[in-house]
Each structure stands twice: as structure tokens, then as C-alpha cells.
Amino acid sequence: MISNAPMHLWQGRIDLAEGLAARRWHQWVQPWAEQQPAGIALLGLACDEGVKRNQGRTGASQGPAALRAALANLAWHGTGPLYDAGDVTCTDHHLESAQKRYAERLGLLLEQGHLVLGLGGGHEIAFASFSGLADHLRRQQPCPRIGILNFDAHFDLRHAPQSSSGTPFRQIAEYCRQAGMPFEYCCLGVSELSNTQALFEQARELDVRYLLDRQMQGWNLPAVEACLDAFLDGIDVLYMTLCLDVLPASQAPGVSAPSAHGVDVQVVEHLVRRARASGKLRVADIAELNPGLDQDQRTARVAARLLASLIH
């Protein structure tokens, strides 16, 4: 099911004394409609069926609403249009149908020239986002080289009888194989203790570029930047996805699988901005926000900040 933009969630402070320069996100965003000027389009996937199938803690289906509420009161520093394109909702456990609908709506937004920012939902959003982008770009000849940049404690390359939040990048690899496209996947922040030897072997077989969470520290930032830059130099178009469990549990408690180590938000935000500055970003999303597990809206707030860093 696709629902219209939940504009009632966009509420916040209004500073009348400072005038137009004091606008916040809730004063700038407008519901998406066709035939509007190109801008930034927010699209939610209200789904955690993939988390359930992956034996995780459910609740991420409420993530898009919580993320909108956290974004609403942020100061707006952008210039172009900002649209809310509503939510695709997973009903009756039909994850694959929800992913297909999300991919189709994302493709429509790309056709209209928008930068699409996805609001998760479980990390099953990744396959939906990539397939929507790839389907759109494959109409071009030759098809641009798509790079997948994932900030995540997990490779999400599992083999499983059903798709889940643990399988999206294996699904993407299979999509690429069938389409004759290169599988360009870079995963930053991997937790060695949260990924089995089998998953590391799968990553090696697929030529995945990755850095461990313990490598993604401020003292090692030049090496991390070099790794990211080399990846970005080899692609034409970037899809970026950020799983909030890449952050330490102290910064992001509201996820299905909190990280004991993680990568500090300052490092993640710096790299997100660096990737955005490449000029290659077409689609990005944030995944695994679970409001029911959050503390003082800490995870929602940091998610909102990271999403805002893609714009400001």
C-alpha cells in the first residue's frame, strides 16, 4: 500500500520574529505531486517484515514516522524544494510486494529529477532502493556504473530461503549478475564479532570493499578517506545506505541490534558529507530506526542529523 504524505507529523517551533530566514523543515516541506520542480523527495518504507524474518526485534515499521517527527523541528538551511512522497507500507507480511512498489515509486521520483532520500524501516529498504535506481538507470545506454556505499555493522549478505533485512546485498549481487552489471559494494563499519567467517568469505568472493569498525576511528581518518575516495573514483552513480546499528549503542540505542563498539557519529557524518560532495549521489536511505527501543529519541535525532547532512 502507498499512502500520501503524513503532513500532520511535520510540526515544530515557529520563530515569527526572525522572518523567513528562521524557517524549519516543517515550514519548508510540501506534499509531493507530479509535475513539480525537481528537488529532494522523502520516501518512506514502513516495513520491518525483513527484520522479523531475520530474527530481529521488530518495530522499525514505525521508523519513517519517528524520523519525520525528528526532522520537523530542525532548522532549514537548504534552498531547493523539499517534498514528502509518503510511505510504502508492508501489509500481510508481503515484503517482496512492498519492495517492488517502493522501487517503482522511487523510479518515478528519479524520472522527475529528484534526489530521493529513503526513510526506513528495516534494512530490507536497501534492495528496494537499489533495484529502483538500477531499473531507472538501465534505460540509459550504456548503463552507468552504480556504486553501493553501506555504513553498517553487518555485511547483510546472508543466504536465506526468504529475503530479509539480512539479505539485501546478496540480492543486489544476484540482480547485478543477472543484469550483467558489476557489483560495486563498499561496506564501512563492519563488526568482526557480528559477522561469521562464512559472511567474510562471501564478502571476499564478491570482491566487497570493507573496513572494520575498529579501523573507522578518528586517528585513522586519512586512510578511511583514501578508501572511500578510491571507491567513489571507480563509479558513475552512488547509492548510499546507512544502517543505524553502525553507530555505538550509546548514540543509537533504538535499533534491533545495538553495537558494542560502532563508529562515532562524527566520523560517519564526515564521510557521508564527503560522499555527497562527489556529486554522484542519486539515492540514499537510513535504515533500522526502531522508536520502541529508542531512549529520549536519541536514535531518531542522530538519524535526522545524518539525513540532514545529505542536504545542508
Swiss-Prot record:
Q: Which GO terms describe its biological process?
A: L-histidine catabolic process to glutamate and formamide; L-histidine catabolic process to glutamate and formate; putrescine biosynthetic process from arginine, via agmatine
Q: How is the cofactor bound?
A: Binds 2 manganese ions per subunit.
Q: Does the keyword Manganese apply?
A: yes
Source organism, top-level taxon: Bacteria
By its UniProt entry, which CDD domains does this protein fall under?
Formimidoylglutamase
List its EC numbers.
3.5.3.8
What family is it from?
Belongs to the arginase family.
**Protein's recorded name:** Formimidoylglutamase
